UniProtKB/Swiss-Prot annotation:
SUPFAM superfamilies named in the record: JAB1/MPN domain, RuvA domain 2-like
Keyword 4Fe-4S belongs to the record: no
Keyword entries, A-Z: Hydrolase, Metal-binding, Metalloprotease, Protease, Zinc
Pfam family for this entry, one: UPF0758_N
NCBIfam families tied to this protein: PRK00024.1, radc
Disulfide bridge partners, by residue number: none
Protein name: UPF0758 protein Vapar_4033
Family: Belongs to the UPF0758 family.
GO terms under biological process: proteolysis
Gene Ontology MF terms in the entry: metal ion binding; metallopeptidase activity
């Protein structure tokens, strides 16, 4: 059925006005943001295709503007920019709520926080969560970009930043834009090098988390620390 042929009570905007946003399905809310479909695909169908392709709202939150191009109807810069802006606001809101919990006391909380911040980056980044003695977040810093090796991640810089923030512990992290989250031997070697360097200033390495869009890997959970 063409969107214009839907009865008024079934159209997302009218439904939201009459019954509130909570009454709408994910695809209906997304359709309100997209506003229009394309030839052969109404806006509700386009919204549902986006959700199906990226694995629901959680997967959509990890997408980039480049990822959206694979969906017919999302080729225009304006539509992609509007959706990416809304997704970024959602990520920031979720990150604020996670930070308000203050204590990063479980791998699950850490992985969720890092997914929101670096999981969808199209390039590789190395970031560090600097924590106090109660494992409360002091700051997340992205320290290096590009292919990460022992020669591109400098232990001295990580140690310097830990001293600057007076951190008691850290969580190391980086992303794999390729999608694979298995650590390489270089990842494991780098972790041990940084762990040894930070131990000299009594800073504990609690974990090294690898993330990609929709996936994460904790070295601590796997017994690699």
């Amino acid at each position: 059925m063409a969107f214009k042929d839907l009865p008024a009570h079934a159209r997302p905007r009218e439904k939201l006005i009459a019954r509130g946003a909570a009454a709408l399905a994910d695809a209906e809310l997304l359709a309100l943001l997209l506003r229009t479909g394309v030839a052969g695909k109404n806006v509700l169908q386009l919204a549902q295709e986006l959700l199906d392709h990226f694995g629901g709202l959680s997967g959509l939150l990890q997408t980039s503007a480049e990822d959206l191009k694979v969906i017919k109807g999302m080729g225009g810069d304006a539509k992609r920019a509007e959706l990416i802006a809304v997704l970024e606001l959602a990520r920031r809101a979720m990150a604020e709520r996670l930070k308000e919990r203050t204590v990063f006391d479980s791998p699950g909380t850490v992985k969720q926080y890092l997914q929101l911040h670096i999981g969808s980056r199209p390039y590789e980044v190395f970031a560090v969560l600097f924590l106090d003695a109660q494992h409360r977040l002091i700051v997340l810093e992205e320290l290096f970009r590009g292919t990460l090796t022992q020669t591109s991640v400098y232990p001295r810089e990580v140690v310097t930043r830990a001293l600057h923030h007076q951190a008691a512990a850290v969580v190391l992290s980086h992303n794999h834009p390729s999608g694979s989250i298995e650590p390489s031997r270089a990842d494991e070697s780098l972790t041990q090098t940084l762990r040894a360097a930070l131990s000299l200033i009594d800073v504990r390495v609690l974990d090294h988390v690898i993330v990609s869009a929709g996936q994460s890997y904790s070295m601590a959970e796997k017994g690699l620390l």
